[in-house]
Amino acid sequence: MVIQRKYRASRRLGVNLWGRSKDPFNTRNYPPGQHGGMGYKKPSDFGKQFAAHKKFKFYYAINSKQMRNIFLKAYKKRGDTGDNFVGLLESRLSSVLYNSGLVPTIFSARQLISHKHVLVNGKTVNISSYVVKVGDVVTLKEKAKNLPAVVFAVQSQEQKVPDYLEVDTQEKSIRYLRVPKYCEVPYPATMEVNLVIEFYSR
C-alpha cells in the first residue's frame, strides 16, 4: 500500500518524483482517478507553490507539520533559507540512508530505521528524523546487510549517490562528509525550493 501511494503521488504531481525506472508515471503520465485522462490543468501561482511544497513533502516522506517546522528552523538560521532548508532535509537519517543507495526507497530507509537495523557511530538509532552531523558514520547491522531490499538496491545501482556522502557498499557504511547546498542535491525531478519559500511566506 505504501508503494502504491508513493506512485500515486508521482502521477498526482505530474513527475517521476524519485526517478525510478518502475514508476508508473513513465507509462501513465496523467493524473490518477476517474477524470485523470483529461490531463493536468495549468496551475495558478499558488498552485505552483503548493505543488512545489508537496514535492518536497512526498520526496522526503514527511508530514505537513514536520515540513513547516523544518522550514521555520531554516528561516531562523543564518544564510540562505533555501540552502538551510534543503540542508536540514538532507541531514535526516532517513535521507542519508536513502541517498546512499543502500536501500531502494525512502520508505524502505524509514522501515529499516524504525526496526532498529541502523547504527550511527556504532549506536542504534530508530528515529528517521535524527539529524546526522558532519563526520558521522551510518552503518547497517549485520542481520540487515543481506536483506533482499538492501541486496537489490546495491546491485541495481539505481540511486545516484551524491558526493557529500562516502559510501562503502561492501561494509554497508556511509560517512556524512558535509551538509549540501540546494544546488548540490541530485534530485531526479525538478524541485523548486524558491516556490516552497514563497508558499510559507504567504
Curated annotation (Swiss-Prot):
Domain of life: Bacteria
Annotated GO biological process: ribosomal small subunit biogenesis; translation
The keyword Nuclease belongs to this UniProt entry's keyword annotation: no
Keyword annotations from UniProtKB, A to Z: Ribonucleoprotein, Ribosomal protein, RNA-binding, rRNA-binding
Pfam families tied to this protein: Ribosomal_S4, S4
Gene3D superfamilies: Ribosomal Protein S4 Delta 41, Chain A, domain 1, RNA-binding S4 domain
Residue ranges of every copy of the S4 RNA-binding domain listed in the record: 91-168
SUPFAM superfamilies reported for this sequence: Alpha-L RNA-binding motif (SSF55174)
Assembly with partners or alone: Part of the 30S ribosomal subunit. Contacts protein S5. The interaction surface between S4 and S5 is involved in control of translational fidelity.
NCBIfam families named in the record: PRK05327.1, rpsD_bact
Primary role: One of the primary rRNA binding proteins, it binds directly to 16S rRNA where it nucleates assembly of the body of the 30S subunit. With S5 and S12 plays an important role in translational accuracy.
Family stated for the protein in its record: Belongs to the universal ribosomal protein uS4 family.
PANTHER family found in the cross-reference section: 30S 40S RIBOSOMAL PROTEIN, SMALL RIBOSOMAL SUBUNIT PROTEIN US4M
Name of the protein: Small ribosomal subunit protein uS4
Organism of origin: Ehrlichia chaffeensis (strain ATCC CRL-10679 / Arkansas)
